[in-house]
Every structure is written in C-alpha cells, then in structure tokens.
C-alpha cells in the first residue's frame, strides 16, 4: 500500500424543485443561494459546502460535480464512496438512480457504470481489469442480498487488514455497461418500497451497490485494486407527516435508528476527541467504516426539500452535512507489491530498525548515567539531530531495569489483542449462526407461503365444487318439479282417458241396444215389405211412374211438393218431408261418427308418439343421473385426497415443531456456554480490571446484540407457531366442510333413490296406459263394425222409404176407389211412421250427445298438447343444461389441471434457481478493446490486437 495522505469528505448539497403536493398546498420556496458553495434557509445563518446544487441542476451536472473525479480515483487504486442523505421524499433515489435507461434523467449509479468503461477503454492497453459487482440492501437492520433473495441475513466480517466486508454476498463479474445495468435492474426489482403520504415510491431500506475493480499491468505485473460504494440511504421519517402504520411504521423505526447511528458516528468523528467511534451500533455504519474516517475518498450528497413545510428537517440535514465536512479520511493507493518490491521494502525497514536500535542504546547509556547521579553535559546529550546521525554501536548492550516492564506491557497488550480478536471471532461465528438460522427461517417461511398458495388453490377448487353442487341441487329441484308436473299431467290425461273410455263403453252398450231394436224393426219392416210386395203386385201399372218419382225424390226432396196437388197429398208430403229430414239427420250422425272415430285414431297415434318421447326422455334423465352420480364419486375421491394431503401437512407441522424444539435446546446450550465464557471472562477481569474496560464495553455491546438477535429469533418462532395454529384452524374448517359435503352427498343419494322409485312407478303407470290404449284400439274396431252395421241399416231404411213413397203415390191416386181400405192402411202406416219417428228421435239425441262429448274432447286436446310441448321444451332445456354442466365441469377440470401444472413448474423453477449458484467466470477487460459480441467467452486482447486468448477465471 502506498504512503497515506489526508483528505476531507466532500459534501454536496442538492435542492429539489417543489412537487405537485407542495405547489397545491401553497408552500413557500425558502432556500436562498449565494454563489456555488453557500445557501441560506429563511433568515438563518449561511451553510457552506463544497458545492450547492439548485433545483434547476441537471442530472449530468450533478454527476460531473459529485462523482466524475471519484471514478478516476477508483481506477487509480483508491477506494471511493458516494452516498445520498436526507429526509424522505427529498430526491435521494432520483439522485443516485434516476430513470435507469433514460439518457437525460439517469442518476449517478448508471452514469458511473458507463463512465468506468469509457475510462478503461481510453487507458493503457497493457492493463487488464477484473470488475465484479454486488448489490444488497439493509432492511430492518438485516443485510439482504438483492441478487439472491434467499440470503436474507448476511453477516459483516473483517479481512486480514481489518476492513469490513459482507460475507456470502453474491458477486457478479461484468465486462460491459449493459451487464452492469442488467444487475442493477435485477436488484432494484427485489428492493423494498412502499407508499407514504410524502412519497409514492418510498425506499424502505438502505441499498449499497459495490463495484470492485482490480487491474494488473501485464508487463510490469503491478496490481491495483479499488472499491466503489454507491449508497442510496432510506430517508428519515416523521410519522406525523408520512402517516406510517403497521409494517411501514416498523420499517420507519429501523430506518430512523440506523440513521441515528450514522449521525452518532459522524458526530464522534467530527469532534475528534472521543476515543471510541460507535461503528458497530448498526450494520450500515459497520460496512461504511472505511468510508467514514478510513481509507476512502468519500462524497456525501445531502438532498433537501425547498418547502417551508419541511424547514426543520432541511436544517437538520444541512447541520449533518456541515459536521460531515469536518471529517478527515486517510487515503492510500491499494497496491499489491511484487516480490522484488517487498524485498526492497524489507531492506529499507531493516536499515531503519538498525538506526533506531543504535539510538535506543545511546539513550539507555545516557539514562543510566543520569540514574547513577552523574550529570551528563549538554554536548554529550543526544539531541534529535544527533539521533539521525548516530551509527549503530557494537558495544555490549546495557541491562536496563525498564526493559522487563516494557516487555510485560507488550505481552499484556498482545494478550489483550488476542482476546479482542477471539471475541470478534466469536461474534462473527454468532453472526454466521444467526445467518444460518435466518436462512432456515426464510426457507420455512417460503415453504409456508407455498403451502398457503396450495391451500388457497384448494380452497378455490372447493368453492367451485360447492358452487357446482349448489347449481346441481337447484337443477335437481327444478327437475323434480318438472317431473312432478309431467306426472300430474300424465295422471290427469290417464283420468280423462279412463272417463272417455267409460263413456265409449256406455255408448257402445247403447249402440248394441239400438242394434237390437233395429233388428226388431227390421223384422217388422220385413213383414211390412211383404205386405207392400202384395200391394206392388196390385199396382204394376204404376211402377214406372213410381220409379221416376223415387228418382226425383233422391235428387231433390223438394220436388215432392210439386207432384202432390190436393190438401191430403200436401199433408202426406209434409209427413214425407219429416221422414226425409230424419234420414238426413241419421246420415249426418253417421258421418260425424266417422270423423270422431278418425279424430280418436289420430289422437291415439299422438299419445303413442308422446309416450315414446317420454320414454326416451326418461332414459336421458337416467343417463344424466348416472353422470351426476359419477361426478359426485369423483368429488368424493378428490375430497379424500385433500384429506390425505391435510394429514401430511399435519405431520410436516409436527416435524417443524420438533425441529423448533431442537433448535431451542441448542440455543439453551449456547446460552450456557455463553455464561461459562462470562464467568471465565470475569475472572480475567479481576486481574486486569483497569486494562480491560474497553473489552467489557465490547462484551456488553455483544450481549446486547445477542439479546436483540435472540428476541428477534423468539418473535419469529412465535410468529411461525401462530401461523401453524392458523393453518391448523383452516384445516379443521376444511374438515368440517368435508363432512358437510359427505352429508350433502348422502342426501343426494337418497333423493336419487326416491327419483328412481318414482321412475319405476311411472313405468307401471305407463304400462297401465298401454293396456288402456289397447282397449281403446279394440273399441275403435268395435266402432268400425258398428258403423258398417248402421250404414247397412240406413240403406235398408232408405229402400223402405222408396217403397213407402211408391205406396203413398198409389194410395193417393186410388184414394176414392179404396176409401175403406185406405183408412185401415193409413192407420197402420201412421203407427209404423210414429214408431220410426221415435227411433230416429232417440238416435238424434244420442248423436247430439256424442257431438257434445267430441267438442269437449277437442277443447281439452289443445291444453294437453300445450302441456306436452312445454314438457318437451323443458326436457330439451334440461338436456342442454346438463350438456353445458358437463362442458363446464370439463373446463374446470382442465383449468384445475393447468393450475396444478403451473404451480409445479413454478416450484420446480424456484428450486432450480436456488440450485443454480454455480461458479462464475471472471471477464477480464483490456483498455482500447470493446467487449466481444459472444456471450460465452471474453477475449483479453494484447496491444495492437494481433492475438487474442480467451481467459476465464473461476470465482
């Protein structure tokens, strides 16, 4: 290391512009700038700094004033530090980072990343550089690696030169500005930020970006190294202004605590009278120990708010900057000497040691003469000038009484240093142990988060299943109502059918009675026909004329009135008209009977088709019920698997509790060992009470720190226990819900059995309806035979009518000659006619009754058809709903499978990322040569670029 030189900490003061909230609030702009180094707040005293940057200063101007020179110093072998200090929302992160990829608004860190490589490319080609970067944050007084989030509580150790460093922090080798920016982007994405009343993106941690540059001259083998700390501090907060609460309030407490420790270190260094500087009060001051009063060129950028609302905080920040400006650092070049240089330095120190020994010998001689009472003349006394000119003497060394005392003090000092070193070593071991425990706790926490995610997904699946079950229950109830309506309609139809069948049987019996009566009448008519045949034999000469009259009567019955001319004939004609009307009514009755029989046949066909559709729909309903039962069994299997999974989780929880108990036992053992060390240390303290006061203070600080770590560990364990109890409560709730689902499933099974029984009853009723349908077919055949019989009888009646008309015509013409015979014949004919009229009247009444019944049936038929159509539509709707439910179930099953695959992939990727910490390849950089385009290897090119060799370094 080169000879040290003193330098002061540079302090730059930057004021940001008023933000929108301050402008809307009407805050006053209070700073007044006097030159480039002085600022006055209100009517107060002036504050002088190395540079004052007003609000209109650009990011490039800030960089040129604050950081450009430090980059050159680091490349020359010095250590450098730049950190921003100020209250929250004062612009620290904007100053240090800005917008990372905006050429105009990027801050100090991205500009340094580009400027370092620009300087390297312009330097001597014989220089070879190795650059590695680290990025970590101090969150809740714990060091957290931003490039590997699994490292959450790293320890601070000291190297052989007593320089603090973060042990276990991830280091990335870089060879271009783009790689540095990638590292910054990766780390910034993992940094803690939050929203407060004063800042939408408030940093909740102190971030430190470390650039370690090693350079070697390949010709002279001269090696230089430099470190550059780029620190973005979290701002001090006043809770009444930020409105912090909950976790944000805890973060604010830790931020203010660490900033208070930084202020104490600055104050101790500024006063210069204190023998102890409290670097170990916080991890941030411990890391920045070299930057504050050590071997480092340090620049502090104090960021201030110009608003009168923050006047008190601004003045406090300015006072901090003035105190820091008085601190002196001792800087030297970090030079690694070669073997030849070490040899020269050794010879030089050896000669210097010889000269000092000779001076000591002369001084001891002079001291002995004084002690023996001899007065040493002034010319024989050794002055400061003579000490430099004295040569080493070869006389026999004089035994001095002071030498043993000096040796004893040196031995005690060495012993004291060894004890302090052992205490520091123990502290480092404790830090390592705490780091391991923290990583274990973080892994457990990550496992808990994974389990929470799985539990949440399980809960979502359960809710979906519950919704599906509810929907199926609603559809089941609706289907029950539909089935009840259909059954009711079928029952009504069956009752109506029974009534109509009974009526048809009654009408059939009436028709049989009428048939018997007609048979009797036929016999009577036969006798009458024989009599008429006898009369016909008597009137053959009138046969031709009677035939013509009969043809005329068949064409038009109205012509009978034109043939008959007398009053008697007119009366007979009226009687004949009545008979003709009754025959016509009989024909109409028969035709209506035909139409009714046809309508009954059509209706029977419709009922058969409706019955077929009902059977088909019932089969579809059975298939739907079977599918629903299959879905319920699948859900039962899924619930059973979830229950097994919850039992596995319970076993894991017990294992975690056992591991926790074992850790508690180990902690108790460590405490016992600590007490034993305390007892031994107290024994030593009695012997060296006056000399070990500083060691006692260090021990107290160590105990306090261990107590704080112990309390934090206990809190974390209690929090994990609470989380485990909460998970157990959730598992109990899921178990209860599972039991409810089982009860619901049993209820659905009972409903299904009831539906099955009802379905069987409906099948029995359908069989009865089929039997009734067969009876109806038989009745239809009987009606058909009856129709043929009636038609034959009507034909017979028609023939009788013809004969009767002929007889009447004959009797009208022979009325004068056969008066007495006609009187008797007329009485007999009148009796026959009245008998026929009575029969026709009865037939007419029967016909009218059948017409009314037919009309009633036709009125009832549209209602039944409408109800049947509604039932068919509902069955179609149920079929479509069932189809849609099946499709939704398939989609949900696919979505669930995709979600499970995604979670598995995420866990697998996370595990791969945790295992992916393999060795890295260092990337040497040569000035004058830009980085190669290949991402796999970087070529170190010698001067002139004629040859290249791929150089790799293992981390």
Curated annotation (Swiss-Prot):
Cellular component terms (Gene Ontology): axon cytoplasm; axonal growth cone; ciliary rootlet; cytoplasm; dendrite; dendrite cytoplasm; distal axon; GABA-ergic synapse
Note down the stretches annotated as region Disordered.
Answer: 909-955
Q: Report keywords, A-Z.
A: ATP-binding, Cell projection, Coiled coil, Cytoplasm, Cytoskeleton, Hydrolase, Microtubule, Motor protein, Nucleotide-binding, Phosphoprotein, Transport
**Which intervals of the chain are annotated as region Globular?**
859-955
GO BP of this protein:
anterograde axonal protein transport; anterograde dendritic transport of messenger ribonucleoprotein complex; intracellular mRNA localization; motor neuron axon guidance; mRNA transport
Which catalytic reaction applies to this protein?
ATP + H2O = ADP + phosphate + H(+)
Which Pfam families is this protein grouped with?
Kinesin
Give the family this protein belongs to, as stated in its UniProt record: Belongs to the TRAFAC class myosin-kinesin ATPase superfamily. Kinesin family. Kinesin subfamily.
Domain comment in the entry: Composed of three structural domains: a large globular N-terminal domain which is responsible for the motor activity of kinesin (it hydrolyzes ATP and binds microtubule), a central alpha-helical coiled coil domain that mediates the heavy chain dimerization; and a small globular C-terminal domain which interacts with other proteins (such as the kinesin light chains), vesicles and membranous organelles.
Protein name per its UniProtKB record: Kinesin heavy chain isoform 5C
> Which species expresses this protein natively?
Rattus norvegicus
